[in-house]
UniProtKB/Swiss-Prot annotation:
Residues at which (R)-pantoate binds: 61, 153
Native species: Koribacter versatilis (strain Ellin345)
Binding site for beta-alanine: 61
Class of this enzyme: ligase
Cellular component GO terms held in the UniProt record: cytosol
Subunit structure of this chain's protein: Homodimer.
Active site feature: 37 (proton donor)
HAMAP family xrefs: PanC
Binding site for ATP: 30-37, 147-150, 176, 184-187
Enzymatic reactions: (R)-pantoate + beta-alanine + ATP = (R)-pantothenate + AMP + diphosphate + H(+)
Subcellular location: Cytoplasm
Protein's UniProt name: Pantothenate synthetase
Amino acid sequence: MRVVRTIAEMQAICRTLHREGKSIGLVPTMGALHAGHISLVRTARTQNDSVVVSIFVNPIQFGPNEDLAKYPRTFEQDCAQLDHEGVDFVFSPGVEEMYPEGTATFVHVDGLSEKLDGRSRPGHFKGVTTVVSKLFHIIPADHAYFGQKDAAQVAVIRKMVRDQNFDIDLMICPIVREKDGLALSSRNAYLDPTQRQQALVLHRALMRVQMLADTGHTDAYYLAEAGRAVIAEEPGAKLDYLEIVDPNTLEPITEIGKGALVAVAAQIGNTRLIDNLVLQAAGNARGPRTS
């Protein structure tokens, strides 16, 4: 496995791979890898000749009062895992390499970027789409792999890819969970044992919505209120949002008959966590499954 630090070197590698007729799979990450990331890597490994994992803690997607400074950084451990998984290249540039003169040019998906997490974290998705756009230019991959856990991010990036005509296939992989249902997240490392238990309320809220949908309820307002009531039962959780929306537009819907995204975000202590499930239709929901 080769660690690449500069844009020029990474671009040269990709040109060589394409000349050789090799397909490229890209897994963008901010490091602090867990089993969810590794599931993306393993999927990419089975579908591409070469796999590139980017590790870059992107400062422009963090707000002024967010956790940029303390975001987990475990580069050596991450590289050991990726080497074990057969990754070919790790692209890990510094901030000065990615933004040598600061950032004057942004990629912004209007409308979608202000919904769900974008409403609570102004400017977050503009930072995400800007760095992902740069990565897609630096690493012209055939496939890029993202996790369903970041459902709003997936919707925003999918719209960016369509609007900007990126020649890349987005591969969205299922959420990976602990046995008790907690969605894996790098930010879970912030939780103490008590908070770790409190965090399970997100999973319980989603399961309540799924259970009601499976018994025939289709009214989105009723289902969302039922999920919010579960969050309200946990004193250690502060609800940011629990909404039922169209998975592509992130617009609220009234009936779940044609499918819906149930998205939730809550603060546990000082840690903000997100989770979601997709309801296929009343009586047929695809949601949290333990792995």
